[in-house]
Amino acid sequence: LVGRPGMGKTPPLQLAYKPIREYERKLFDKFCYELDLYEAACATKESGSKEMKKPILKRVTLDDFTLEALVLEHYNNLRGIAINYDEILGLLANTDRYGKNPMLERLLSIWSGCHLENTRVKNDRPQRVEEPCVNIIGTTQTKRMKELMVSKFMDTGFLDRILVVYPKSK
């Protein structure tokens, strides 16, 4: 969503995401409840505590993440992840966040339906998502659009995958 400063780009996104945020809050409350039960069972060393699995928080949205975190969160929620950046250029700046970060290439691969795999995070097992579903939404100011018009985004086809919405002024 593109518009001048103060045009009101953020409120429509907040309204659209309200049901998702409410759902995510319910997931968080459920996770906290299950974690309390798990920790209580482990603390008392109940007979069934060894069979209990530590609960995992399912997330629906991300706003600040590494590539490894994106794969992990998507692995924990195979239904999909939405990336919501109020200022979309913040996400795109993160494509260079850690030097030779393959974030941009991975986002292009996700768009093409390629699997995601994470073997570098220190977990008991690697994470793999066969059919990723990652949606990206955000806003920017009209004058900042030129920051998207650079070879890094144009030559890779990244810009071709963006739907730009520019509402008419009142």
Tell where the protein language model's regions lie, with residue ranges.
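Phosphate-handling catalytic cores of nucleic-acid transaction enzymes
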Residues: 1-170
